[in-house]
UniProtKB/Swiss-Prot annotation:
PROSITE patterns: AMIDASES. Heterotrimer of A, B and C subunits. The lineage of its organism: Bacteria, Bacillati, Cyanobacteriota, Cyanophyceae, Synechococcales. The gene is gatA. This is Glutamyl-tRNA(Gln) amidotransferase subunit A. It comes from Synechococcus elongatus (strain ATCC 33912 / PCC 7942 / FACHB-805) (Anacystis nidulans R2). InterPro entries: Amidase (IPR000120), Amidase_CS (IPR020556), Amidase_dom (IPR023631), AS_sf (IPR036928), GatA (IPR004412). Transmembrane segments: none annotated. GO terms for cellular component: glutamyl-tRNA(Gln) amidotransferase complex. Allows the formation of correctly charged Gln-tRNA(Gln) through the transamidation of misacylated Glu-tRNA(Gln) in organisms which lack glutaminyl-tRNA synthetase. The reaction takes place in the presence of glutamine and ATP through an activated gamma-phospho-Glu-tRNA(Gln).
Length: 479
């Protein structure tokens, strides 16, 4: 499938109709889903109806937005009115939201065509999409490997050309890590730039919605459509949203790029980053080594803060108002306990228990309060770094995609795949992953580009220049 601009050009020239584009995407989904399992719900009827509306506007001579008629996948933790939203959890089986999330509403108003809801780790808790209660998504580059998580369905769908772009959410790396594993572009915006209204909460001080695509330009276009203040979200920032595509330039002259020394290794992922740095330098960037001494403490701090917030957010799932409820409970308390025991998967229950323990009276200071202090120190490290450079780079992940089942019995090993991405969430910064090479098995590496608060312009500029100087993004999985 072509890029957003290419499809837009075909539509306005009437070379293809929006219905034809939607039907092609739906046919691709039908062909690949038995092996890929990217989607939990395919919304074919809605997609065709939305596409017909775009065609009618074109026929009437109306101007259409760049996203009009563009097939998009939506992570299944974003509320979609009249369409099931399960968060890949048994406890939300059959839940149909009565309202629409702000981001999906904005995309619908722009004329985007939603082809379905994508798979994820249950309640966005995981790094492989193996924690879904319904199915395990495969990596398009190697069907025996994971696509990453928690937004693995969205990343795999974009990589496999089932849709042009997709939405994900990122709490500790859940957009960037699967983007790296699937060889696509994934952006976590500055905290508060994109409304969280209608996003089913995991850890509210960390969650942020962002785009997946196969190019930096498509990422910039999608970000421009979903960003901006929303009075329905108390954490939404009151900022002007620029046309992010104006910052996409091929030269990096005058840009200072900092390499986080704590992420520099001789590993294959580290070597891929070093090769990328040479490209950036050749484009005119000044490369500096920058130390973020508390970077490695992000992982343990995150696994106190995020589960603590999750234990509070997930208290609302009790079998009373919506979703799964056990039958024939003896008492109200029995119904609560059995509903949650049967409705939540093992990883979700593990994180609820960790969070409840960290917030308990005797341990609050030792764990939660200390983790928040570490979070502040990490933020200060980034502030010091951005006083010297414009963007920071690191590998997105320590490795390429691992085999399905390889890490499920070892949660700590699984958690380490988010080692490079978590500090960015703790500091509320924008971070992007894009392809920067392939290993001997033909699996993609990701380069992470981190910006200062609300400096998505510099992140996208750096990413675009690198992308245009290389050919990694042009490779596609053989499906």
């Amino acid at each position: 499938m072509a890029s957003i601009r290419e499809l837009h050009s075909q539509l306005v020239r009437k070379e293809r109709s929006a219905v034809e584009i939607a039907e092609a995407a739906l046919q691709r989904i039908e062909t690949l889903e038995p092996q890929l399992k990217s989607f939990l719900h395919v919304t074919a009827d809605q997609a065709i109806a939305q596409a017909k509306a775009v065609d009618q506007r074109i026929a009437a001579g109306e101007e259409i937005s760049l996203l009009a008629g563009i097939p998009i996948g939506i992570k299944d933790n974003l509320c979609t009115r009249g369409i099931p939203t399960t968060c890949a959890s048994k406890i939300l089986q059959g839940f149909v939201p009565p309202y629409e999330s702000t981001v999906t509403q904005r995309l619908a108003e722009a004329g985007a065509v939603a082809v379905g809801k994508t798979n994820l780790d249950e309640f966005a808790m995981g790094s492989s999409t193996e924690n879904s209660a319904y199915q395990t998504t495969a990596n398009p580059w190697d069907l025996t490997r994971v696509p990453g998580g928690s937004s693995g369905g969205s990343a795999a769908a974009v990589a496999a050309d089932e849709c042009v772009v997709a939405l994900g959410s990122d709490t500790g790396g859940s957009i960037r890590q699967p983007a790296a594993f699937c060889g696509v572009v994934g952006l976590k915006p500055t905290y508060g730039l994109v409304s969280r209204y209608g996003l089913v909460a995991y850890a509210s001080s960390l969650d942020q919605i962002g785009p997946f695509s196969r190019s930096v330009e498509d990422t910039a276009i999608l970000l421009g459509a979903i960003a901006g203040h929303d009075p329905k979200d108390a954490t939404s920032l009151k900022v002007e949203v620029p046309d992010y595509t104006q910052f996409l330039k091929p030269s990096l002259a005058g840009i200072k790029v900092g390499v986080i020394t704590e992420t520099v290794t001789d590993s294959p992922a580290g070597q891929a980053m070093q090769a990328a740095l040479e490209v950036l330098q050749g484009l005119g960037a000044e490369i500096r080594e920058i130390s973020c001494p508390r970077f490695a403490y992000g992982l343990p701090a995150y696994y106190i803060i995020a589960p603590s917030e999750a234990s509070a957010n997930l208290a609302r799932y009790d079998g009373v108002k919506y979703g799964y409820r056990v039958e024939e409970a003896e008492t109200l308390i029995d119904m609560y306990c059995r509903t949650r025991a049967e409705g939540f998967g093992s990883e979700v229950k593990r994180r609820i228990m960790i969070g409840t323990y960290a917030l308990s009276a005797g341990y609050y200071d030792a764990y939660y309060l200390k983790a928040q202090k570490v979070r502040t120190l990490i933020k200060q490290d980034f502030e010091a770094a951005f006083a010297e450079v414009d963007v920071l780079v690191s590998p997105t992940t320590p490795t390429t995609a691992f085999k399905a089942g390889e890490k499920t019995a070892d949660p700590l090993s699984m958690y380490l795949s988010d080692l490079m991405t978590i500090p960015v969430n703790l500091a509320g910064l924008p971070g992007l992953s894009l392809p920067c090479g392939f290993d001997e098995a033909g699996l993609p590496y990701g380069l992470q580009i981190i910006g200062n608060v609300l400096r998505e312009d510099q992140v996208l500029h750096t990413a675009y220049a690198y992308e245009q100087a290389t050919e990694w993004h042009l490779r596609q999985p053989a499906l």
